[in-house]
Design a protein with these regions (language model features):
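Short alpha-helical DNA-recognition segment
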Residues: 19-44
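DNA major-groove recognition helix of helix-turn-helix/homeodomain DNA-binding modules
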Residues: 55-70
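Residue-level signal for the short linker/turn that defines the boundary of a DNA-recognition helix
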Residues: 7, 25-26, 52-55
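A short, Lys/Arg-rich alpha-helix, primarily the initiator
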Residues: 1-24
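Short, charged recognition helix plus adjacent turn
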Residues: 72-77
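Short polybasic/polar patches that bind polyanions
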Residues: 14, 33, 62
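Residues within the helices of the helix-turn-helix
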Residues: 10, 29, 69
Length: 77
């Protein structure tokens, strides 16, 4: 049995960017800088081609002020 981890990072990030008084804070580059990763890593996570480490998943949750379960979802294939 295999599964799939899906995430809502792109949707959440874009929503925050639209609602923020400082939208640059929520660009891929801005988020990457705050997480200590490259912009390419953020892009890969958003596309679902890279699953972040547990440590990075917690950093994402903290950046968004959300629980990990609100960002990532496991689905059976």
């Amino acid at each position: 049995m295999t599964g799939l981890i899906v995430n809502r990072i792109k949707a959440i990030r874009e929503q925050r960017m639209a609602q923020s008084s400082n939208p640059e804070h929520w660009t891929q580059e801005g988020l990457a800088r705050r997480l200590g990763v490259t912009r390419q890593t953020v892009i890969s996570i958003e596309k679902g081609t890279y699953n972040p480490t547990l440590f990075l998943a917690f950093k994402l949750a903290r950046a968004f002020e959300m629980r990990i379960e609100e960002i990532f979802e496991y689905r059976d294939e």
